[in-house]
Amino acid sequence: MEILPIPAESFKVGFIGAGKMAESIARGVVASGVLPPNRICTAVHSNLNRRDVFESFGVNVFSTSEEVVKESDVVIFSVKPQVVKKAVTELKSKLSKNKILVSVAAGIKLNDLQEWSGQDRFIRVMPNTPAAVGEAASVMSLGTGATEEDGAIVAMLFGAVGKILKADEKMFDAVTGLSGSGPAYIFLAIEALADGGVAAGLPRELALSLASQTVLGAATMVSKTGKHPGVLKDDVTSPGGTTIAGVHELEKGSFRATLMNAVVAAAKRSRELSQS
């Protein structure tokens, strides 16, 4: 059967699962003007609070997932990994080649998604929690039946909550170790920087504000200047100055090696979980 292109000017998006990630994506899509809220839907079975949340910014909320699939051209499975198989198989008879299917469930491979759904027009996306503030680092991989045009539509949707890049699915465990788990590493770093500020005599509130803004500013410099972070580091480390003294302490504590080890360990754990 011929795959029909999704109408770019009128397509509708439906979320299976009405949790925080679905909310973040939906809010981003609406706020950025990618889609009006009346072209987005989800289903809430019993949690009235989640219904109120989605309805508060104009999203259509149905009572069943079957209604979501029926009304949508792009169906995004935004449920926990342990229940995604059940969610997909229960809707199998409603899915077709005329719909783009998307999963954001960590560790669930395209082969499994395609087998459970009976469809190969699937796209796997790995977002991360900063999607909640429009600063996600997402990676996507296309299934065997998904077209480049399908990928462009999904990139447009997830681009509304941050940056989205394309990669081979075999890289997803490493992606999990870096961008998936990475926010936690940075939260820890911000907390440690703030604690250092307190130890040096700063009030807690001031220390935390300076720490978080410093990390944000440094990340923005890397992103916007295109300079290698090592070059930016060299630019701020004067001979015999304060910054190189601090960098020296980080090097003595194996700061870089510890971060590298954290990424590798998380990637290894992701690989183990996906094989279990």
Curated annotation (Swiss-Prot):
Gene3D superfamilies: NAD(P)-binding Rossmann-like Domain (3.40.50.720), ProC C-terminal domain-like (1.10.3730.10). It catalyses: L-proline + NADP(+) = (S)-1-pyrroline-5-carboxylate + NADPH + 2 H(+); L-proline + NAD(+) = (S)-1-pyrroline-5-carboxylate + NADH + 2 H(+). The keyword Amino-acid biosynthesis applies. InterPro entries: 6-PGluconate_DH-like_C_sf, NAD(P)-bd_dom_sf, P5C_Rdtase_cat_N, P5CR-like_CS, P5CR_dimer, Pyrroline-COOH_reductase. One of its GO terms (molecular function) is pyrroline-5-carboxylate reductase activity. One of its GO terms (cellular component) is plant-type cell wall. Keywords: Amino-acid biosynthesis, Cytoplasm, NADP, Oxidoreductase, Proline biosynthesis. The keyword Nucleotide-binding does not apply. Its EC number is 1.5.1.2. Pathway: Amino-acid biosynthesis; L-proline biosynthesis; L-proline from L-glutamate 5-semialdehyde: step 1/1. It is found in: Cytoplasm. GO terms for biological process: L-proline biosynthetic process; response to heat; response to salt stress. It holds the Pfam family P5CR_dimer. Belongs to the pyrroline-5-carboxylate reductase family. NCBIfam families: proC (TIGR00112). This is Pyrroline-5-carboxylate reductase. It comes from Arabidopsis thaliana. The lineage of its organism: Eukaryota, Viridiplantae, Streptophyta, Embryophyta, Tracheophyta. The gene is PROC1.
